[in-house]
Amino acid sequence: RFLSAIPYNSKEECKSPKRVLAERNAHCFEGALFAASRLRELGYPPLLMDLRAWNDDDHVIALFKERGRWGAVAKSNFTTLRFREPVYRTLRELAMSYFDFYFNTLGQKTLRAYSRPLKLSQFDEKNWTETEDDLEYIGDAFSKLPYYELLDAEQVARLVEVDGDLLKAG
């Protein structure tokens, strides 16, 4: 609820969870970092996944697993791109749960791929949860991970635009 309540950060920066808490704003990536840090306090490993888009912004989500099923926590201006219950058997299933709601202002469905989970514990020595430094290097780490396509070229060519009511609802 905290992530949904705070304003969206439109600045080109990447704050630590400590700074998100202090400044009371976050963009999608900062929100995912914050969620992963809170999930860690509850005993989950701190994991992020990137949802790669075409003609749109990527979306980063914090992952958690309960009883063998994946769920996610995220920050977004779009309510349909936030929390997911832990009911998905695979990361692909989880990624696909965002598909119909992942669209740009032109009404194009834009989600195309998802990353392997990024393990944030590899950045513990840099104190990623509390540092005052910019954390853009964590975002850069996604470029070293494999991505898995969700659609083939034929499927992309056959996509229909988002329904007008859904586009308005955003």
Sequence positions of predicted segments:
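A structural boundary/capping signal
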Residues: 1-170
